[in-house]
């Protein structure tokens, strides 16, 4: 908890692999806030679509799927999120390469996205939250108290993703991962009002070559200012 002052609503946006989820989780833990991983919510729906054989291009079926699906985030011991899909723990499975390949298109479906945004706004209403995603500061929480744009070079993001995948037991090729991230960047920057965008009021933090603890301390300094 904070020192008796109003608890903040903190928005973190940025491209895939920039480290925002890791940083957001730690910042939330340090502040005693709730961490909301919006990307995990979309990944859970993408996973269910894959299981049911629903193409990422079938917007109507995906929207219906969202209406019939329960995605729940629970606080994990490390301050992160435990992701439940219709009551099943899918925290690890949603990070698979197969899910990563379709989640950007799945998350672009308007009705699906709006349903999850309503849930996310409700979770943030009381304050004391750190939420990360692509359009948090611009659309989901436009009145957030602090807005951060977390970025890193494409090469750095690809290296991190490869390391993560290999640590989880997946095979990963650096060139293929870099191409996949570049493709996701292009998709994420062309989603209309939900596009990934660096806002004029956002505090930009480039994590290239920086340790996680350095980035966390930089963000906390901004959060503690009056």
Swiss-Prot record:
Q: What is its EC number?
A: 2.7.4.25
User: Quick one: a GO cellular component term?
Assistant: cytoplasm
- Please tell me where ATP binds in this chain: 14-22
Output the SUPFAM superfamilies linked to this UniProt entry. Answer: P-loop containing nucleoside triphosphate hydrolases
Known Gene3D superfamilies for this protein? P-loop containing nucleotide triphosphate hydrolases
User: What domain of life is recorded for the organism?
Assistant: Bacteria
Molecular function terms, GO-annotated: ATP binding; CMP kinase activity; dCMP kinase activity
Where's it found, cell-wise? Answer: Cytoplasm
Q: Which Pfam families match?
A: Cytidylate_kin
Its GO biological process terms? pyrimidine nucleotide metabolic process
Q: Which InterPro entries match?
A: Cytidylate_kin (IPR003136), Cytidylate_kinase_dom (IPR011994), P-loop_NTPase (IPR027417)
The reaction(s) this protein catalyses:
CMP + ATP = CDP + ADP; dCMP + ATP = dCDP + ADP
The record's keywords, sorted A to Z, are:
ATP-binding, Cytoplasm, Kinase, Nucleotide-binding, Transferase
Annotated coiled-coil positions are none
Family, as annotated? Belongs to the cytidylate kinase family. Type 1 subfamily.
NCBIfam families for the chain: cmk
This chain belongs to the protein called Cytidylate kinase
Q: Which organism is it from?
A: Symbiobacterium thermophilum (strain DSM 24528 / JCM 14929 / IAM 14863 / T)
């Amino acid at each position: 908890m904070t020192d008796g002052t109003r608890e903040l609503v903190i928005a973190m946006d940025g491209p895939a692999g920039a480290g925002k989820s890791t940083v957001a989780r730690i910042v939330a833990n340090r502040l005693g806030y709730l961490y909301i991983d919006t990307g995990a919510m979309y990944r859970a729906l993408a996973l269910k679509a894959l299981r049911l054989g629903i193409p990422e291009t079938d917007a109507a079926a995906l929207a219906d799927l969202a209406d019939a699906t329960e995605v729940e985030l629970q606080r994990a011991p490390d301050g992160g999120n435990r992701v439940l899909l219709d009551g099943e723990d899918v925290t690890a499975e949603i990070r698979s390469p197969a899910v990563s390949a379709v989640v950007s298109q799945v998350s672009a479906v308007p009705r699906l996205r709006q349903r999850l945004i309503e849930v996310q706004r409700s979770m943030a209403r009381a304050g004391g939250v750190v939420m990360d995603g692509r359009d948090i500061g611009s659309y989901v929480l436009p009145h957030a108290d602090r807005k951060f744009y977390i970025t890193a070079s494409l090469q750095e993001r690809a290296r991190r993703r490869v390391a993560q995948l290999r640590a989880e037991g997946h095979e990963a090729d650096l060139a293929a991962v870099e191409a996949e991230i570049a493709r996701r960047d292009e998709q994420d920057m062309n989603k209309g009002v939900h596009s990934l965008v660096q806002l004029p009021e956002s505090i930009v933090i480039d994590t290239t070559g920086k340790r996680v603890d350095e980035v966390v301390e930089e963000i906390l300094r901004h959060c503690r200012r009056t």
